[in-house]
Regions:
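Small-residue-biased structural context
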Residues: 1-239
C-alpha cells in the first residue's frame, strides 16, 4: 500500500476527501515542528500554541469520525486505532506536563523532545498504515463524506490538552461543546494578554487560569469517560 504522503489529492479522492485534508494538516504540522526547533521563551510558546490549535482539534475529529469507521471496516481495526489513541493520549499528557513546567525547568527540554517525537510517530503511523488501509476499503464518495464530517467536528473541537477525557465516543463527543467553549475563550484571553501589558495583561492571564481550572473540573465528569479503553485512561493527577 502507498503512503498517503506520496499520493496526490486526486489519488486521495479530491481536496474534500478526508485523506487529503489529513495530509494537508500533517504538512502544516511538519512546518510548525521545524519552526519550533531552537525557539525559546515567548516565541516557543507562540509556536506551541499554534501546534496545539492544529493538533488537538485534528485528533479529536479523528477519534470521533475516522476511528469508529476503521473499527467497523477492518478486522484488525481495533488494534490499529488503539495504537494511535495511545499516541494521542501521550501527547495530551506531555502537553499537560509541559504547561506546568517553568520555562527554565531542566525537565522541559526532554518533555518537549518527546512531544515532537510522538507527534512525528503519529503522523507516520497514520500516513503509512492506517489511512492506506482505510483507503483500500472505502469508496471515493465515502472518503469525501467523511471529509465533510471530519472538518465540521474539527472546527468545533477542543483546542487544548484534555488527558482525562475518553479518546472514544460517546465520552469524547459529549465533552466537545463545554471544553471547546472553555478552550477557545482561553485562547482568546491569552492572545490578547500577549499583546497587552500591565494590569490588563495580568487580568487576562488570571482569566486564563480560571478557564483552565474550569476545564479540568469538566474533564472529571463521569460521562466524559464513557467508552474509553483502559490503556488510555488517565487519573488526571498531572492536570
Amino acid at each position: 500500500m502507498t503512503s498517503i504522503a506520496e499520493q496526490t489529492d486526486a489519488e486521495l479522492g479530491g481536496r474534500v476527501s478526508v485523506l487529503a485534508r489529513q495530509k494537508r494538516d500533517h504538512v502544516k504540522l511538519d512546518r510548525l515542528l521545524q519552526q519550533l526547533e531552537g525557539t525559546h521563551g515567548q516565541e516557543q510558546e507562540r509556536v506551541l500554541l499554534r501546534i496545539y490549535r492544529l493538533v488537538f482539534p485534528h485528533a479529536f475529529a479523528e477519534e470521533s469520525v475516522l476511528w469508529p469507521v476503521m473499527r467497523r471496516a477492518l478486522p484488525d481495526g481495533h488494534a490499529l486505532t488503539l495504537e494511535v489513541e495511545q499516541e494521542h493520549q501521550e501527547v495530551n499528557e506531555l502537553v499537560t506536563r509541559l504547561e506546568r513546567l517553568d520555562p527554565d525547568d531542566p525537565e522541559r527540554g526532554p518533555v518537549l523532545e518527546r512531544l515532537v517525537e510522538v507527534l512525528r510517530e503519529d503522523v507516520r503511523d497514520e500516513e503509512d498504515e492506517l489511512f492506506p488501509r482505510l483507503q483500500a476499503v472505502t469508496t471515493t464518495a465515502e472518503l469525501r463524506r467523511l471529509g465533510v464530517y471530519w472538518e465540521v467536528l474539527r472546527r468545533i473541537a477542543p483546542t487544548r490538552a484534555h488527558p482525562v477525557v475518553a479518546r472514544r465516543p460517546p465520552g469524547n463527543v459529549i465533552s466537545a461543546l463545554p471544553l471547546s467553549v472553555l478552550d477557545r475563550l482561553r485562547d482568546a484571553a491569552e492572545a490578547v494578554a500577549r499583546r497587552s501589558s500591565g494590569d490588563v495583561a495580568d487580568r487576562l492571564w488570571a482569566a486564563s487560569r480560571v478557564l483552565t481550572a474550569a476545564a479540568h473540573r469538566v474533564e472529571r465528569f463521569p460521562l466524559l469517560r464513557i467508552g474509553e479503553d483502559p490503556s488510555t485512561r488517565s487519573t488526571g493527577s498531572a492536570a
